[in-house]
Amino acid sequence: MAGLFDLIETVGASIAALKTHVDLVDDWTPEAWSEFCAAAKKADLLIFEDRKFADIGGISRKQMAGVYNIRGWSDLVTAHLISGPDIVDGLQAAWSDVGREGGVLLLAQMSSRGNLLEPAYTAKVVAKGKAHSGVFGFIGNGSRPEELVLLRDAVGDGKLIWTPGVNLAVGDGEMGQRYGHPRDAVLAGSDCVIVGSGIHKADNPGEQAAAYAKASWDALCDR
């Protein structure tokens, strides 16, 4: 977990939210995680757990509790809508159970090669998500600006679009991941770019985070 604390110190000034995969932290303990969350809050960062919930509402509500108590510290979570809109109710109920509020980002598109989130499915996700107050926004495909333009048109201005699949080095990554440039993603309609290995695997994460922030902010100003 030392690396996570280091990230807050080195990239915190250049980001708005810190994306986590809590179940990938090998040395996780409740005590250390609590300290980590406190450090993120002190740095004025949202904690974005990229859990991609997909089960029915009741199970998702229980998963938000569970070993990691995601409901107790996450500000945002991701979810598929394949099981129906009740999943959003379940996730929101989990936050309510502990007196907190949070937002759900629904996966409307994905950037991985061969994914099954086709346009007809995307349209249904957007329609259901726009009508639900518990939906903060949507996940779009940052590697394909032409898809993002269509998503932006469908979503309108009432919800945000966050996009993974962006990298300053455009191309293909590991295990089917694809990358587009953050500027292109923002110009196409993204409100926030999600960067993982492009920052935390860099030789100088702080400099890279600042570079992504500048590229995306400049694009937003030009949009």
Locate the predicted segments by residue.
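Conserved, mostly hydrophobic/aromatic
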Residues: L18, D50, V77, L151, ...
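Conserved anion-binding
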Residues: A54-V149, A154-K159, A169-G171
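Substrate-binding cleft of secreted/luminal carbohydrate-active enzymes
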Residues: S190-V193
